[in-house]
Amino acid sequence: MNNNYPLGSIAQAVDVLKNEEVIAYPTEAVFGVGCDPDSETAVTRLLELKQRPVEKGLILIAANFEQLKPYIDDSMLTEQQRNTIFSAWPGPVTFVFPALPSTPSWLTGRFDSLAVRVTDHPLVVELCETFGKPLVSTSANLTGLPPCRTSQEVLAQFGDGFPVVVGETGGRLNPSEIRDALTGERFRQG
């Protein structure tokens, strides 16, 4: 890793991501851990860190809808469904879309769909724009522990050397709502 970047900076985080490592960063409600969705090595590291089975599938968080298009099939959406989704984005609502056949199973798990969100958190927008693609995003916590709400909590759970983007969460109390993009069914209340 290039040590010329300020610790906790976007530049340092992008360098870590490009090296197929996992980072932590603030989101709308809690800190998330994430990695390059196109790197099976990075996703495997994230799953091992979280002790999360690959079968559960993951969420991608992006700066804009264009970043998500290589992973999801939005061809079945009606105009009304599109309006519902885009009225919630950018923001703390995650939608489950049909996945493209080319989307790797390390992202979709046992499903033929993928959960995605366009964030309104300024640091995450900048992170995804600088990295040039979305990130895998899951809450920053070890199994059995509450999600981290500060960078200090991330370091306490994951270790002092863990790469974390310094910043504040968006102040929301609950994680993002999760809905089906086609049916509107709510899987998790936000």
Curated annotation (Swiss-Prot):
Read off the Pfam families from this record. Sua5_yciO_yrdC (PF01300)
Give GO cellular component annotations, separated by semicolons. Answer: cytoplasm
* Example GO biological process: tRNA threonylcarbamoyladenosine modification
**Keyword tags:** ATP-binding, Cytoplasm, Nucleotide-binding, Nucleotidyltransferase, Transferase, tRNA processing
Role of this protein: Required for the formation of a threonylcarbamoyl group on adenosine at position 37 (t(6)A37) in tRNAs that read codons beginning with adenine. Catalyzes the conversion of L-threonine, HCO(3)(-)/CO(2) and ATP to give threonylcarbamoyl-AMP (TC-AMP) as the acyladenylate intermediate, with the release of diphosphate.
This protein's encoding gene: tsaC
- Source organism per UniProt: Enterobacter sp. (strain 638)
Taxonomic superkingdom: Bacteria
In Swiss-Prot or TrEMBL terms, this protein is called: Threonylcarbamoyl-AMP synthase
Q: Domain YrdC-like spans what residues?
A: 7-190
> What's the catalysed reaction?
L-threonine + hydrogencarbonate + ATP = L-threonylcarbamoyladenylate + diphosphate + H2O
